[in-house]
Amino acid sequence: LNDHLSFNFDKFVPNQNNILFQGEASVSTTGVLQVTKVSKPATRSIGRALYAAPVHIWDSTTGRVASFETSFSFVVKDEPEKSNGVDGLTFFLAPANSQIPSGSSAGLFGLFNSSDNKSSNQIIAVEFDTYFGKTYNPWDPDFKHIGVDVNSIKSIKTVKWDWRNGEVANVVITYRAPTKSLTVSLSYPSDQTSNIVTASVDLKAILPEWVSVGFSAGVGNAAEFETHDVLSWYFTSNLEANPA
């Protein structure tokens, strides 16, 4: 069994053979991973893109748990420019061979089909959420945000996201198994500041031993139009030695 996995996409190619495409995710001729539809109308568009090989995230025989790091660049672009945003992008870990649940469009990001916090979901996600509004998304804070989601669309931890429409965002997500610490950092090259959120997450208690990793995004039922494009993606994971 492979206890270590690393891959790196500087760019993508159409019909990339080591990416599983679900819903309306695709790769453009220019090498961009487009997680949702890029042409109007995109109402209720939903997509996911997963690395084809499963990741060994913990081992029941030894009790070992993986530490991982992933970095990626993405662009979320809205039209018209002053729109509210609909709805956002996630990086997530879910059971291997996971599919898009029915009823999971818009602010449920193709991950959940309700706001229920069910342990059977077996999902950890980092959401980059451009839409907030108590009418449709009562679980959200009152600002655009980065959130850590555990089995539920209601984040266990959020931080305000200074979203820049159409700008490239650089993200680094690290998970340290010994401390059960998940840290997310997002920055824009045009700016020296970062939006950072850290949460305590026990992978072994939430996820199955083998998971799929990737991106998901959803567009709501609105006049606004939003695209969710991933430009590059690096991931590495390693099962740690036995805990003392």
Swiss-Prot record:
Q: Which residues are glycosylated?
A: N113, N117
Where do the annotations place Ca(2+) binding? D129, Y131, N137, D142
A Pfam family this chain is assigned to: Lectin_legB
Question: What keywords appear on the UniProt entry?
Answer: Calcium, Glycoprotein, Lectin, Manganese, Metal-binding
Task: Give an example GO molecular function.
Answer: metal ion binding
Q: Where does Mn(2+) bind?
A: E127, D129, D142, H145
| Function of the protein | Di-N-acetylchitobiose-binding anti-H(O) lectin.
How does this chain assemble? Homotetramer.
| Record comment regarding domains | The peptide 129-Asp--Trp-139 is responsible for the carbohydrate binding.
Belongs to which family?
Answer: Belongs to the leguminous lectin family.
Q: What is this protein called?
A: Anti-H(O) lectin 1
Q: Which organism is it from?
A: Cytisophyllum sessilifolium
